[in-house]
Curated annotation (Swiss-Prot):
<dbReference type="GO" id="GO:0017025">
    <property type="term" value="F:TBP-class protein binding"/>
</dbReference>
<dbReference type="GO" id="GO:0017055">
    <property type="term" value="P:negative regulation of RNA polymerase II transcription preinitiation complex assembly"/>
</dbReference>
<dbReference type="GO" id="GO:0034605">
    <property type="term" value="P:cellular response to heat"/>
</dbReference>
<comment type="function">
    <text>Part of the NCT transcriptional regulatory complex that acts as a key regulator of ergosterol biosynthesis and the azole exporter cdr1B. The NCT complex binds the promoters of genes linked to azole susceptibility, and especially represses the expression of cdr1B transporter.</text>
</comment>
<comment type="similarity">
    <text>Belongs to the NC2 beta/DR1 family.</text>
</comment>
<dbReference type="GO" id="GO:0046982">
    <property type="term" value="F:protein heterodimerization activity"/>
</dbReference>
<keyword id="KW-0804">Transcription</keyword>
<dbReference type="GO" id="GO:0001046">
    <property type="term" value="F:core promoter sequence-specific DNA binding"/>
</dbReference>
<keyword id="KW-0238">DNA-binding</keyword>
<dbReference type="Pfam" id="PF00808">
    <property type="entry name" value="CBFD_NFYB_HMF"/>
</dbReference>
<keyword id="KW-0539">Nucleus</keyword>
<dbReference type="GO" id="GO:0003713">
    <property type="term" value="F:transcription coactivator activity"/>
</dbReference>
<dbReference type="GO" id="GO:0016480">
    <property type="term" value="P:negative regulation of transcription by RNA polymerase III"/>
</dbReference>
<dbReference type="InterPro" id="IPR003958">
    <property type="entry name" value="CBFA_NFYB_domain"/>
</dbReference>
<dbReference type="InterPro" id="IPR009072">
    <property type="entry name" value="Histone-fold"/>
</dbReference>
<keyword id="KW-0805">Transcription regulation</keyword>
<dbReference type="GO" id="GO:0003682">
    <property type="term" value="F:chromatin binding"/>
</dbReference>
Length: 142
């Protein structure tokens, strides 16, 4: 591991609401199972430790390659080196899904930029369309 290990994970945490949402998705209320607060907190600590372990190993790998940026390949190798090779296919699938979502966001942003209108002008047009639709709705015979 790196010389720059964290002295304590006390200040590191994951959002409780996010962890609770994941737990709820895995254990739906219909299952009759519950997850105690202590169990949730322990799970959060384990997740932080896992992330710290993987990121530290990936950092070491990138440093050995004289890279300044940790890439997906470094994380993949860290998982393999630490004995978590079974996770790699799922991690790569999620990474690919994330890339696709980013591309979709970029396309949406560029469509707005390509319109040549400012956000203010687009908002004004939208309000005019709403006003027009409301007038048509109110004028329609009953």
């Amino acid at each position: 591991m790196s010389d720059r290990e964290f002295s304590s994970n006390d200040d590191l945490s994951l959002p409780k609401a996010t962890v609770q949402k994941i737990i709820t998705e895995i254990l739906p209320p219909s299952s009759g199972q519950t997850f105690s607060k202590d169990a949730r907190d322990l799970l959060m600590e384990c997740c932080v430790e896992f992330i710290t372990l993987i990121s530290s190993e990936a950092n070491d790998i990138s440093e050995k390659e004289a890279k300044k940026t940790i890439a997906c390949e470094h994380v993949e190798r860290a998982l393999r080196d630490l004995g978590f090779g079974d996770y790699i296919p799922e991690v790569l699938a999620v990474a690919e899904e994330h890339k696709e979502q980013l591309k979709s966001r970029e396309k949406k942003q560029s469509k707005m930029e390509q319109s040549g209108l400012t956000e203010e002008e687009l908002l004004r047009q939208q309000q005019e369309l709403f006003r027009s639709a409301t007038e048509k709705y109110n004028a329609a015979p009953e």
